[in-house]
Amino acid sequence: MKKCTILVVASLLLVDSLLPGYGQNKSVQAQRNLNELCYNEENDNKLYHVLNSKNGKIYNRNIVNRLLGDALNGKPEEKKDDPPKDGNKDDLPKEEKKDDLPKEEKKDDPPKDPKKDDPPKEAQNKLNQPVVADENVDQGPGAPQGPGAPQGPGAPQGPGAPQGPGAPQGPGAPQGPGAPQGPGAPQGPGAPQGPGAPQGPGAPQGPGAPQGPGAPQGPGAPQGPGAPQEPPQQPPQQPPQQPPQQPPQQPPQQPPQQPRPQPDGNNNNNNNNGNNNEDSYVPSAEQILEFVKQISSQLTEEWSQCSVTCGSGVRVRKRKNVNKQPENLTLEDIDTEICKMDKCSSIFNIVSNSLGFVILLVLVFFN
């Protein structure tokens, strides 16, 4: 049994080492081949169209050959059919031939006059054609009657209705605000009550209702104590309603709405940038220079091997017209490029093979 196990292990190791297309390596190489091949839809479509065109040409050639073969086979049959036609001509009686040749043919000669009649027919046709063309031409110019329809655009008289917007004469009613002559009593603003009235001008925030600004006339009225009956009706209703409603509504709404969306957007952008930075690999200058020192003897103007056997790394080459020693090279004298080694299966194969050899040696020497 021991010998059998030794032989089996040895055979497996030999197969793995000598035949890389066997076992695990086979699947790995198949994946690599599939990844190396570029299946572009454009190329596939081109190949498909090329094959179809070739098949179409072959099919057309076959059809042509068949038709030619049928034609060649049909010609002798027609020749065979031709002599019976001659026989039919022979079967005709001589009397008929004589009847055909004499007076009838001579009578047919004068019908050359109908040939003369033929050209006039062509002339009639020629005359008819231009007449038809004239009729069509007449019908075409008749179409300009359609442009006569611009009378419809005459309807813009309807826009003449903007005379209705002339109704803004009604807003001319602001002549009532001309009543500020009453506030002309500012002689009394010496009273502190007058400065309180500037709250009323704050009301212009609602210019949508110009009637409101007319209200400041009311506060001016308290200065005219001569008419105490009118002010108590207007000011208590309008001024208390407008100033408390407008100032508290506007300032609290605007400041909280503007600053809040901004930090949110910035946070999202920061998160996205963080994710992108995590995905991308950017080597440092020290790593690049260390790799250059390692490959100083092999560094040329062609790309070097990747600095990593598995994962993402860097490959390097000299720039043209650079004659410095590798020790004195800087990042300005070197072209760098990021390389990725996604397939690390070879490492696992090496490990498995090494373990197999160790097991083989143990079985051979310690048993």
UniProtKB/Swiss-Prot annotation:
Keyword Cytoplasm listed: yes
Asked whether the UniProt record includes Iron among its keywords, one would answer: no
What UniProt keywords apply to this chain's record, in alphabetical order? Cell membrane, Cytoplasm, Disulfide bond, Glycoprotein, GPI-anchor, Lipoprotein, Malaria, Membrane, Repeat, Signal, Sporozoite
Q: Compositional bias (Pro residues) spans?
A: 228-262
Q: Which Gene3D superfamilies match?
A: Thrombospondin type-1 (TSP1) repeat (2.20.100.10)
Q: Which compartment or compartments is the protein found in?
A: Cell membrane; Cytoplasm
Compositionally skewed regions (Gly residues) per UniProt: 143-223
Q: Where is this region: Disordered?
A: 72-281
Q: Which residues form the propeptide?
A: 345-367
Q: Where is this region: 8 X 4 AA approximate tandem repeats of Q-Q-P-P?
A: 229-260
**What segments bear the compositional bias annotation Basic and acidic residues?**
75-124
Q: What is this protein called in UniProt? A: Circumsporozoite protein
Segments carrying the region annotation (15 X 6 AA tandem repeats of Q-G-P-G-A-P) are 139-228
Q: Where is the lipid attached (GPI-anchor amidated cysteine)?
A: C344
Its lineage reads:
Eukaryota, Sar, Alveolata, Apicomplexa, Aconoidasida
- Quote the record's domain comment: The N-terminus is involved in the initial binding to heparan sulfate proteoglycans (HSPGs) on the surface of host hepatocytes. The N-terminus masks the TSP type-1 (TSR) domain which maintains the sporozoites in a migratory state, enabling them to complete their journey to the salivary gland in the mosquito vector and then to the host liver. The unmasking of the TSP type-1 (TSR) domain when the sporozoite interacts with the host hepatocyte also protects sporozoites from host antibodies. The TSP type-1 (TSR) domain is required for sporozoite development and invasion. CSP has two conformational states, an adhesive conformation in which the TSP type-1 (TSR) domain is exposed and a nonadhesive conformation in which the TSR is masked by the N-terminus. TSR-exposed conformation occurs during sporozoite development in the oocyst in the mosquito vector and during host hepatocyte invasion. TSR-masked conformation occurs during sporozoite migration through the hemolymph to salivary glands in the mosquito vector and in the host dermis.
Tell me what organism the protein belongs to: Plasmodium yoelii yoelii
Name the family.
Belongs to the plasmodium circumsporozoite protein family.
Q: Where are the sequence repeats?
A: 139-144, 145-150, 151-156, 157-162, 163-168, 169-174, 175-180, 181-186, 187-192, 193-198, 199-204, 205-210, 211-216, 217-222, 223-228, 229-232, 233-236, 237-240, 241-244, 245-248, 249-252, 253-256, 257-260
Q: Which PROSITE patterns match?
A: TSP1
Tell me the gene name: CSP
Q: Function of this protein?
A: Essential sporozoite protein. In the mosquito vector, required for sporozoite development in the oocyst, migration through the vector hemolymph and entry into the vector salivary glands. In the vertebrate host, required for sporozoite migration through the host dermis and infection of host hepatocytes. Binds to highly sulfated heparan sulfate proteoglycans (HSPGs) on the surface of host hepatocytes.
Which region ranges are annotated with the description Region I?
126-130
Q: Which GO terms describe its cellular component?
A: cell surface; cytoplasm; plasma membrane; side of membrane
User: Compositional bias (Low complexity) at which positions?
Assistant: 263-277
Record note on modification: During host cell invasion, proteolytically cleaved at the cell membrane in the region I by a papain-like cysteine protease of parasite origin. Cleavage is triggered by the sporozoite contact with highly sulfated heparan sulfate proteoglycans (HSPGs) present on the host hepatocyte cell surface. Cleavage exposes the TSP type-1 (TSR) domain and is required for productive invasion of host hepatocytes but not for adhesion to the host cell membrane. Cleavage is dispensable for sporozoite development in the oocyst, motility and for traversal of host and vector cells.
